[in-house]
Regions:
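N-terminal basic/disordered segments at the start of proteins
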Residues: 2-12
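Generic N-terminal amphipathic, Lys/Arg-enriched alpha-helix
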Residues: 14-31
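Short coil-to-beta-strand transition motifs
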Residues: 274-281
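Conserved small/polar residues in nucleotide/adenosyl-binding loops
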Residues: 285-290
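N-terminal glycine-rich anion-binding loops that anchor highly charged ligand groups
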Residues: 41-45, 52, 56-60
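N-terminal, Lys/Arg-enriched amphipathic/low-complexity engagement segments
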Residues: 27, 35-38, 45
Length: 290
């Protein structure tokens, strides 16, 4: 899907990949990251976020949780990393990279809670009251206070296989009351995934039903007196989609493939702001023609 795009929009990276592989500088089965292009993309995304009042946590799991790029992004002004699984969070902690949102797709296991919570993430996503209680207990023991993001589910939401879980809207009020009784934690926001996806027929990034679920959950929390909530509305976050996030009332995005210019939107739009920023180098052997 992206080979034509990267050949058209980042020819120097393609030429370098071929040259280095042929000269033995890199081995086959290597991901080659274009540091400068990734940072250019990140700068465009941050500028769009700043202009629209949307804060972005950067996601680097697609490019190996690269700490060098993570440090450059924090130096650029990004608040921190979104770590959808605990291994990514631990990698960032070990490299002194600030944590933004942790646990959105894979909940933090109990054995990793102390190390990750000591790093003081901006917010931690929880699917269940059991996980909220675990975080409350660890924060109480460590003398910390942690904001929690509630992953919410609504009827008709789009969910990927293996990524089910969260608080259904009809149980949200009782869940919030239970969390309000827990020490050292507080509800700080709501999220779902994916809230936006590229639609090939429309040739554009469009909102998913999940977005309305997040909006409804936020309305329910505001009715309970909550203010300054984080509405995290990820997937396909890039310069093009950030105004959509803002228009929907979202406060946060999570650019990942947007940073490398490799969302489906970028494959179909050669005029997109972000350019392809990485390449997979491999060898393909073909039999000679008879």
């Amino acid at each position: 899907m992206f080979l034509k795009t990267v050949m058209e929009r980042n020819q120097p990276l393609v030429r370098l990949g071929i040259e280095w592989q042929q000269n033995g500088v890199i081995l086959p089965d290597t991901y080659l990251l274009d540091y400068d292009t990734i940072l250019e993309n990140a700068r465009s995304i941050k500028q769009a976020g700043d202009a629209n009042g949307v804060q972005n946590f950067f996601m680097l799991k697609q490019i190996g949780r690269n700490p060098l790029i993570a440090r450059a992004l924090t130096d650029m002004g990004y608040v921190g990393a979104v770590c959808v699984d605990f291994r990514e969070a631990l990698t960032m902690v070990e490299n002194q990279i600030p944590l933004g949102n942790v646990g959105h797709l894979v909940q933090i296991p109990r054995a990793a809670l102390k190390k990750i919570l000591r790093a003081k993430p901006v917010i931690v996503t929880v699917y269940t009251l059991e996980k909220a209680r675990e975080i409350s207990a660890v924060c109480t023991e460590l003398g910390l206070h942690q904001k929690l993001m509630l992953r919410v589910l609504g009827e008709g939401d789009m969910l990927y296989s293996g990524q089910y879980g969260g608080f259904e809207l009809q149980e949200l009020d009782s869940a919030v009351r239970a969390i309000e009784a827990m020490p050292n934690v507080e509800v700080g926001g709501v999220c779902s995934f994916p809230c936006f996806l590229y639609d090939e027929a429309a040739q554009d990034i469009l909102p998913m039903p999940n977005l309305r679920t997040v909006q409804t959950a936020a309305e329910m929390l505001r009715a309970r007196g909550y203010r300054d909530l984080m509405l995290n509305t990820p997937s396909a976050t890039c310069t093009h989609s950030i105004p959509m996030i803002a228009a929907a009332g979202g406060t946060h995005g999570e650019p990942g493939h947007g940073l490398t210019g490799t969302t489906p939107y970028h494959a179909g739009h050669p005029d997109a702001e972000e350019r392809p920023g990485y390449l997979y180098v491999c060898l393909l052997y073909t039999s000679p023609s008879p």
